[in-house]
């Protein structure tokens, strides 16, 4: 009986030790990510980055995204709904992280469409046709024009602008900033410079709500 009690106590102690170690590890990961983001705050937002929402919003939501990323597509309407539910409170800043093969051409098309005042329309059109644009995680770039037709874009100008060194520089800078911030997957969110404690839309909503409440103090 005594040996059984000792065994149970030892097992309980081992379990508690494991749980404590896991919690400490998770907290350390979050602290390191926050310190990294704070130390590299200038890498979070660039003056050229596409933005949506109130320029003076108390919450700045930075999203590193890949237009060929399925999870990015799933999050896009959810983020817009969250912004609509908090009018004037959230400013969305999009940063490019074209990790899929050929996705840099989608980004170039978005930036070229932006020059014609059609960035958000082009983004939604490409996201809507994402399944037809990418096969086996590789973007079929020759299909881009088909799905941008009908937006009122000058496609000849768009194709020419896609080859612009300025657009190439935007992509290169965003990828460099993603590397600085150790972004390795998409979407990656920062709420007023803070990374999510763990990935998920509920976690994103909670952190945004927390920052909105702080702004009221």
Which residues fall in each region the model found?
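Conserved strand-loop elements at the edges of beta-sheets that form or border functional pockets
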Residues: 54, 63, 198
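A generic local structural motif
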Residues: 46-50, 78-80, 175-177
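A short beta-strand-turn-helix
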Residues: 42-59, 84
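Ser/Thr/Pro/Gly-rich low-complexity linker/stalk segments immediately outside membranes or between
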Residues: 27-42
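Structural alpha/beta surface segment adjacent to cysteine/selenocysteine redox centers
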Residues: 57, 62-68, 73-149, 154, ...
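Short secondary-structure boundary/capping elements
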Residues: 43-44, 74, 170
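Short clusters of hydrophobic/aromatic residues that line enzyme substrate/ligand-binding pockets
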Residues: 50-52, 133, 196
């Amino acid at each position: 009986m005594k040996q059984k009690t000792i065994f149970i106590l030892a097992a309980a102690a081992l379990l508690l030790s494991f749980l404590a170690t896991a919690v400490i590890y998770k907290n350390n990961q979050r602290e390191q990510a926050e310190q990294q983001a704070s130390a590299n705050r200038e890498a979070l937002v660039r003056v050229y980055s596409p933005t949506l929402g109130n320029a003076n919003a108390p919450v700045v939501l930075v999203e590193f995204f890949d237009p060929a990323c399925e999870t990015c597509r799933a999050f896009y309407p959810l983020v817009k709904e969250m912004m609509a539910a908090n009018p004037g409170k959230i400013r969305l800043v999009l940063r490019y992280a074209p990790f899929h093969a050929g996705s840099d051409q989608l980004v170039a098309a978005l930036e070229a469409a932006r020059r014609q005042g059609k960035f958000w329309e082009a983004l939604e059109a490409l996201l809507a046709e994402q399944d037809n644009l990418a096969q086996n995680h590789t973007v079929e770039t020759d299909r881009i024009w088909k799905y941008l037709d009908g937006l009122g874009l000058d496609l000849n100008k768009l194709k020419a602008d896609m080859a612009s060194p300025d657009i190439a520089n935007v992509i290169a800078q965003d990828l460099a900033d993603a590397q600085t911030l150790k972004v390795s997957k998409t979407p990656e969110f920062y709420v007023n410079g803070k990374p999510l404690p763990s990935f998920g839309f509920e976690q994103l909503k909670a952190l945004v709500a927390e920052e909105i409440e702080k702004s009221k103090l």
